[in-house]
């Protein structure tokens, strides 16, 4: 053994070939600060070996290196800029030493090589991969850019266009594509990986392969003519401006850095990467996006822990077909859980099957599946008008009309047709689970399972624990949702649960703005372009359905009369009374026509202004800041109340529910991350300017306490240790 660290070791393999093996405690390898330091120490030993002829890098895990240790990011990002820059210089000196070894080097890559893992293998001369490879640089999705030389080496290896596509979009690619673009040199089966790697190294050692020529382009300026450079970087900047926009600075910074570094060799180019990385790491966007990643891990870990002793349903059923039922049936079948789809009429069943078939055909068109797979999935969705087969069902979700009487009747009837241990769930969006459970003989086997539309796209499923729901029932439904590829978050019961409970105060803020003379078009524009929502409130209401929102508004008002009972006729009432139900009938705040792809395209409709005039004061202009404050304060206050009342268990779960269920702008990180970034005291000062608008604008006492004591909602993060100690970690 030449060297042994906590996360990697170095040993002789054969005939002057050494192997450097990543083998961290736990299930995966991460390129954390300790591993970078250990890699430097291993290279120090290696540089003294006069008999060294070649070096093989490999992993003892199912994945090569899954990336940097993102749990370290928040503390690293708090380190002063100069100190972070010094540590990056140190880390890059380690990878440069790997790249500068006077012998051929090869990385044998299995499974994942992402972020720092990818940057590590870019420093070797050759790369062999297994068919399960996923390799790429996802840093821009975290609000940063590659910092270990990825933005320097990748363009010089692949050419500007392929590298820009991977880096700017934060992409990873599979083995076949990686081979095609030159990111790996060969793909071999796992059992042949080491044998193949040694064979390549031997060829390089004997001179049959020119490893020096392979290495040289990574040390030089990017080989691009002025015209080629202008085309590549102009197109890339245009694409990034269109897709990322101003709220996500990392992709544009990465492209501009690669452009600026193109005319330099490795050292100068790495300095430019360093100078771009450090300011990005100190942005609120990076902290928010890293926070989302960590919260996602927390939420998924919690679901995994909850279901570790639970068997996933092997046969499921959906009550109520149509678009929603068909979407749920598709998602279950697509992920391997066969489903019976029951309705009371053929028309709805046909609609549900058509929806499932449409979604499968899209997968076929994209090349994700073949005809055989499509037929196999669709055959596991069984449409029926009766309860045949329900005696074999492990889990049922009801997705009928949002009417408590109908839902109770359907659930009570179904309970008599299934086994005593079968779990029942309702896809209600607002009706309290306790109310629906009152119709059942076994309420302990019942809970809420709230999907979001469109089911196949929206990651969140709210699992609602009723007063009598058993732990086993919750765990079984969480297991089913996880199997469907969704992110389940357990919340406690109340009208609207968590997501809709906090959404309708936001809509109430919108209604009050329109009542006071705001133009809905400007409100939409400000909330989309300035705050960052994917849709403004008017557009969102049209997509949700004005009729659906009108009904839900009444349910929420009954549940929370003190705050949500309005004393005036609002825009939603006016549109509902005029049968303008939104996209579903082509008329809402906007008029909708199908575009060339058959998707609804919104257009202005002067008639809506006349309708809204009856529920609005004289038009007046509001500043962007005032619009954002009046829209967001009711939502933020309600989110805080839900945490204080135990409806949602933690800030992390609340923020992920908002991001995954409502599209809360990820660069803000969620409501609690946004609050922590603003500071509770600053938020309180802002909110108090609007408390005259009514109870929705009154800040909860818990938040006032946070402001008084300057306390954040997330645990405070301490800056990483000084860079000197990180080097020798």
Curated annotation (Swiss-Prot):
Residues 1-189 are annotated as: Enoyl-CoA hydratase/isomerase. It catalyses: a (3S)-3-hydroxyacyl-CoA + NAD(+) = a 3-oxoacyl-CoA + NADH + H(+); a (3S)-3-hydroxyacyl-CoA = a (2E)-enoyl-CoA + H2O; a 4-saturated-(3S)-3-hydroxyacyl-CoA = a (3E)-enoyl-CoA + H2O; (3S)-3-hydroxybutanoyl-CoA = (3R)-3-hydroxybutanoyl-CoA. Coiled coil: none annotated. GO terms for biological process: fatty acid beta-oxidation. Its EC number is 4.2.1.17, 5.1.2.3, 5.3.3.8, 1.1.1.35. Gene3D superfamilies: 1.10.1040.50, 2-enoyl-CoA Hydratase, Chain A, domain 1 (3.90.226.10), NAD(P)-binding Rossmann-like Domain (3.40.50.720). Pathway: Lipid metabolism; fatty acid beta-oxidation. The active site is at residue 450. The keyword NAD applies. PANTHER family: TRIFUNCTIONAL ENZYME SUBUNIT ALPHA (PTHR43612), TRIFUNCTIONAL ENZYME SUBUNIT ALPHA, MITOCHONDRIAL (PTHR43612:SF3). Heterotetramer of two alpha chains (FadB) and two beta chains (FadA). Involved in the aerobic and anaerobic degradation of long-chain fatty acids via beta-oxidation cycle. Catalyzes the formation of 3-oxoacyl-CoA from enoyl-CoA via L-3-hydroxyacyl-CoA. It can also use D-3-hydroxyacyl-CoA and cis-3-enoyl-CoA as substrate. This is Fatty acid oxidation complex subunit alpha. It comes from Salmonella enteritidis PT4 (strain P125109).
């Amino acid at each position: 053994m030449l060297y042994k660290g906590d996360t990697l070791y170095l040993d002789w393999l054969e005939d002057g070939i050494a192997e450097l093996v990543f083998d961290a405690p736990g299930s995966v390898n991460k390129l954390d600060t300790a591993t970078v330091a250990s890699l430097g120490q291993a290279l120090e030993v290696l540089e003294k070996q006069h008999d060294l002829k070649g070096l093989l890098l490999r992993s003892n895990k199912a994945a090569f290196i899954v990336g940097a240790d993102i749990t370290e990011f928040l503390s690293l990002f708090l380190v002063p800029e100069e100190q972070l820059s010094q540590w990056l210089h140190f880390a890059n000196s380690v990878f440069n030493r790997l790249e500068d070894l006077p012998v051929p080097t090869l990385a044998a890559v299995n499974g994942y090589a992402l972020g720092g893992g990818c940057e590590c293998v870019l420093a070797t001369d050759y790369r062999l991969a297994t068919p399960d490879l996923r390799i790429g640089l996802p840093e821009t999705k975290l609000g940063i850019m590659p910092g270990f030389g990825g933005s320097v080496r990748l363009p010089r290896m692949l050419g500007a266009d392929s590298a820009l596509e991977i880096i700017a979009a934060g992409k990873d690619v599979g083995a076949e594509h990686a081979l095609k673009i030159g990111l790996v040199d060969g793909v071999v089966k796992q059992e042949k990986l080491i044998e193949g790697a040694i064979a390549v190294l031997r060829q390089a050692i004997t001179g049959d392969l020119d490893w020096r020529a392979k290495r040289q382009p990574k040390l030089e300026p990017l080989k691009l003519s002025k015209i080629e450079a202008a085309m590549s970087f102009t197109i890339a900047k245009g694409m990034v401006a269109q897709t990322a926009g101003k709220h996500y600075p990392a992709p544009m910074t990465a492209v501009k850095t690669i452009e600026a570094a193109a005319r330099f060799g490795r050292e100068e180019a790495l300095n430019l990467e360093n100078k771009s990385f450090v300011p990005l790491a100190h942005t609120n966007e990076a902290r928010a996006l890293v926070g989302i990643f960590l919260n996602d891990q927390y939420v998924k870990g919690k679901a995994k822990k909850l279901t570790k002793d639970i068997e996933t349903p092997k046969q499921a059923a959906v009550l109520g077909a149509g678009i929603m039922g068909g979407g749920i049936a598709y998602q279950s079948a697509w992920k391997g859980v066969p489903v019976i789809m029951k309705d009371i009429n053929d028309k709805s069943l046909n609609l549900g099957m058509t929806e499932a078939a449409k979604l499968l055909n899209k997968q076929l068109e994209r090349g994700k599946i073949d005809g055989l797979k499509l037929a196999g999935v669709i055959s596991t969705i069984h449409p029926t008008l009766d309860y045949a087969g329900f005696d074999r069902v492990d889990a049922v979700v009801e997705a009928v009309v949002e009417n408590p009487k109908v839902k109770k009747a359907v659930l009570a009837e179904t309970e008599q047709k299934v086994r005593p241990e079968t779990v029942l769930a309702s896809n209600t969006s607002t009706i309290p689970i306790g109310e629906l459970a009152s119709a059942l003989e076994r309420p302990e086997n019942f809970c809420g399972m709230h999907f979001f539309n469109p089911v196949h796209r929206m990651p969140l499923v709210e699992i609602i624990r009723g007063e009598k729901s058993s732990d086993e029932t919750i765990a079984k439904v969480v297991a089913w949702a996880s199997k469907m590829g969704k992110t389940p978050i357990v919340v406690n019961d109340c009208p609207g649960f968590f997501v809709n409970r906090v959404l309708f105060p936001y809509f109430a803020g919108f209604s009050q703005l329109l009542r006071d003379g705001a133009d809905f078009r400007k409100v939409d524009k400000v909330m989309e372009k300035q705050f960052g929502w994917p849709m403004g409130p008017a557009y969102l209401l049209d997509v949700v359905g004005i009729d659906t929102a009108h009904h839900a508004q009444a349910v929420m008002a009954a549940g929370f009369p003190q705050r949500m009972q309005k004393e005036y006729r609002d825009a939603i009432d006016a549109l509902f009374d005029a049968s303008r139900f939104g996209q579903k009938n082509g008329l809402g705040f906007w008029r909708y026509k199908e575009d060339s792809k058959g998707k609804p395209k919104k257009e202005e409709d002067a008639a809506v202004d006349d309708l809204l005039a009856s529920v609005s004061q004289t038009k007046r202009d509001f500043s962007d800041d005032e619009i954002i404050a009046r829209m967001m304060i009711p939502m933020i206050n309600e989110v805080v109340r839900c945490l204080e009342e135990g409806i949602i268990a933690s800030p992390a779960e609340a923020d992920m529910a908002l991001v995954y269920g409502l599209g809360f702008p990820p660069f803000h990180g969620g409501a609690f991350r946004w609050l922590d970034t603003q500071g509770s005291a600053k938020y309180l000062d802002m909110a108090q300017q609007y408390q005259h608008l009514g109870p929705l604008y009154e800040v909860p006492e818990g938040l006032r306490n946070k402001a008084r004591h300057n306390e954040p909602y997330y645990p405070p993060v301490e800056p990483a240790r000084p860079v000197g100690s990180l080097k020798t970690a």
